[in-house]
A protein has these predicted regions:
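Conserved active-site segment immediately N-terminal to the catalytic lysine
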Residues: 174, 188-199, 208
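Conserved PLP-binding catalytic core of the aspartate aminotransferase-like
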Residues: 289-320
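Active-site phosphate-binding strand-loop segment of PLP-dependent enzymes
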Residues: 15, 114, 125-181
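PLP-dependent aminotransferase-like
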Residues: 82-149
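Active-site C-terminal subdomain of aminotransferase-like
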Residues: 20, 198-280, 294, 363-365
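PLP-dependent enzyme catalytic core of the Aspartate aminotransferase-like
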Residues: 3-9, 322, 335-365
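Conserved N-terminal alpha-helix of the aminotransferase class I/II PLP-enzyme fold
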Residues: 39-84, 91, 105, 113
Length: 365
């Protein structure tokens, strides 16, 4: 399919992950000389006119893609999503209380980090069934004085996704969208904060994008909050308070343009749904491989599956790699297999995976 990978190795890594071939080729062409500047973006001053154009254009393009309202700031930051686990309570815990919905390891880590700074209340959890579903969030017992409600919208390890946002009862919603960023349309106005590491669906590791409603960016932060973790510091400096991850942002900008070229977020959603259906349909009829997530909560991005036999799982991963299907081993905390099928994964990659799974099943029945 035009715009996607054309070689025979398919990378199903959960992140850092597959990038569009077109983007990689453009970056290679510009590696030694970016648009006649005589230098690589890697060498370029972040205060230069050329780089100023790169970061401003990247912001414009993500605003266009997500239809981000004018009263939201877009920040290109460092420290990954994990650093935002601390930045969120530091910037938002006015009453030193927040509600967390625990649907996997990353939501749990964010919840544990927030407990350092105030009272983090777990208002729902799917830990009772190994995070294999999304709990009902239509009528949560949210403390009246909670400053925000926090979710990890797509759970990379366990393969679940919020299909409907929780009823926050008027509280600001904060969402870690690291593994579903730009995979489908989103109504930004329903969130107070959206953030995510880019290394799954948007670019190379080293950049986190935070989209924050302006009224939440204030000087009123927890005492002792480091200057670099104050959103106001970064917002006032347009993400240039210190040297940003210049090259990573440059690649993100190219991915934004690629998504636009492919038809925007509606087209990405259709593409991702088609890929996921191919894989889930096979899992639902297979006698050997089983999905681990309740069907209504299945992620379009991360698909975990097992054979039920650890030795057979290991054999599958080894033979899949030899067949050009890379990085299918499940997360170290859960085992089994996981296929991450982000935006840049072509349909052909999923078709080849299913073809191999059928062959493996026949040979190992």
């Amino acid at each position: 399919m035009e715009g996607f990978l054309s070689w025979e190795e398919y990378n199903f890594s959960a992140g850092p992950a597959v990038l569009p071939e077109e983007v990689l080729k453009e970056a290679a062409d510009e590696m030694l000389d970016y648009k006649g500047t005589g230098m690589s973006v890697m060498e370029m001053s972040h205060r230069s006119k050329a780089y100023d154009e790169i970061i401003k254009e990247a912001e414009k393009d993500i605003r266009d893609l997500m239809n981000i309202p004018d009263n939201y700031k877009v920040l290109f930051l460092q420290g990954g999503a994990s650093q935002q686990f601390a930045a969120v309570p530091m910037n938002l815990m006015k009453n030193k209380k927040a509600a967390y919905i625990i649907t996997g390891q990353w939501a749990k880590k964010a919840y544990q980090e927030a407990q350092i700074y105030g009272e983090a209340v777990a208002v729902a959890s799917s830990a009772d069934k190994t995070f294999s579903y999304i709990p009902d969030c239509s009528d949560l017992d949210i403390p009246e004085d909670a400053d925000y409600v926090y979710i990890c919208e797509n759970n990379t390890i366990y393969g679940t996704k919020f299909k409907e946002l929780p009823n926050t009862k008027g509280k600001d919603l904060v969402a870690d969208v690291s593994s579903c960023f730009l995979s489908e349309p989103v109504d930004v106005s329903k969130y107070g904060v959206i953030y995510g590491g880019v290394q799954k669906n948007i670019g190379p590791a080293g950049v986190v994008i935070s989209i924050i409603r302006e009224d939440l960016i204030t000087e009123d932060v927890l005492e002792g909050t480091p200057t670099m973790l104050k959103w106001k510091t970064q917002a006032d400096a347009d993400s240039l308070y210190n040297t940003p991850p210049c090259y990573g942002i440059y690649i993100c900008g190219k991915v934004f343009k690629w998504i636009k070229k492919m038809g925007g977020l509606e087209a990405m959603k259709a593409h991702n749904e088609k890929k996921a259906k191919i894989l889930y349909d096979f899992l639902d009829q297979s006698k050997m491989f089983k999905g681990t997530v309740e069907p209504k909560d299945r992620s379009l991005m991360n698909v975990p599956f097992v054979t039920g036999n650890a030795e057979l799982d290991a054999k599958f991963v080894k033979e899949a790699k030899a067949a050009g299907l890379e990085n299918l081993k499940g997360h170290r905390t859960v085992g089994g297999m996981r296929a991450s099928i982000y935006n840049a994964m072509p349909i052909e990659g999923v078709e080849k995976l299913v073809e191999f799974m059928k062959k493996f099943e026949a040979e190992n029945a």
